[in-house]
Amino acid sequence: MRFLHLSDLHLGKRVCEFSMLDDQRYILEQILSLLDSHPVDAVLLAGDLYDKPVPPAEAVRLLDWFLTELSRRELPVFAISGNHDSADRVAFGSALLAESRVYVSPVFSGPPEPITLTDAHGPVDLYLLPFLKPVMVRHVWPDAPIESYNDALSCVLDHCSPDPARRSVLVAHQFVAGAASCESEEPSVGGIDWVDAALFDKFDYVALGHLHSPQKVGRNTLRYCGTPLKYSFSEASQHKSVTFVELDEKGSVTIAAEPLVPRHDLRELRGSYMELTDRRNYEGTAVDDYLHITLTDEQDIPEALARLRVIYPNLMRLDYDNRRTQTRQELDAPAKAEQKTPLEHFADFYQLQNNQPLTHEQAAFCQQLIESIWKEEDA
């Protein structure tokens, strides 16, 4: 059985106040073309369908169009809500959508029930697990000892028992320990929201969402597919793709990536104003790309942003890197420290002293300790 694994569409996202909707439609059209030339049996959407819990109407229409196009191709779709989504809004109409074989995770109320597809090798059970927070799981099992994200996921999966003789796929949206993150994702403070990769061992393939870099975590079948587009300049060097997964007989899983080509790339340029405005340097290049330009001039260039946008119309961000800005960064460091939480300060100190980050258990313990100290002071 062959799947397309997608996640983190972030429909409606704005990067540096530039709307990405046209680029998102372009890349979704490209994905549909890939599906036409690389047939699959189902599509997995591993959360963060939207960029905000209350998405703009244009983003809702875009997702509606994409799901309709998948349904027109008679492809079952298995989708979950992510941390950027409203689980209630994503689940709206899910019973009706299921009649068209668009299966959407419900608002979390207990362990997921399998949805079964069948091929020549037998049944494949698919489990849809929306983004989880500890409070959601404590609401279902109030007597369970749940203090962390890891405890929460462990509790849920302890109540989920896929048949070991059958192939099983889990679609989930969590931060798995050992994975690499980037700045466009919501920050993880001291690893407090990490979950252990070993919790997923009972599944043949785990289609993960949440992190924007395509990667495996430990075993090859525990995988983030990454975003289809670059959503921050920390992703500028990444090569975006979609992930095709083929489950043959039990224990046989083949994974392949197909590259995606964006309408506009997201890149970084660096140089002096004279270098970047020299026709010989920019002619024949993709000047319409989304750009972060760093000027190395020692003096500010008057109206540099407006003047550079004559050549580079999609210039998103402009910075300077010179002796003056380097000195300013040193002076700004104490101010940035004032904006950090006590846990973030301790996590930085721990990293400096031990050359490794806090574990999620340590971070959870520290947070409890900090809260108890603050309560004592308030009392």
Give, region by region, the residue ranges found by the protein language model.
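Divalent metal-coordination and catalytic microenvironments
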Residues: D8, L28, V43, D48, ...
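Binuclear metal-dependent phosphoesterase catalytic core
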Residues: P112-V124, L129, L222-V287
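Acidic, glycine-rich loop-and-beta core segments that form the ion-binding/anion-interacting portion
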Residues: L199-H239
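Accessory, non-catalytic peripheral segments of nucleic-acid enzymes
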Residues: S37, A42, L247-A379
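His/Asp/Glu-rich metal-coordinating catalytic cores
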Residues: P55, H84-K216
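N-terminal active-site segment of His-dependent metallophosphoesterases
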Residues: M1-T68, R72, E361-S372, E376
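A short helix->loop->beta-strand "cap" motif at the edges of active sites that frequently abuts
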Residues: R72-V77, R166
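Glycine-rich phosphate-binding loop signature in dinucleotide/nucleotide-binding domains
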Residues: L35-P39, D119-H121, P162-A165, G284-A286
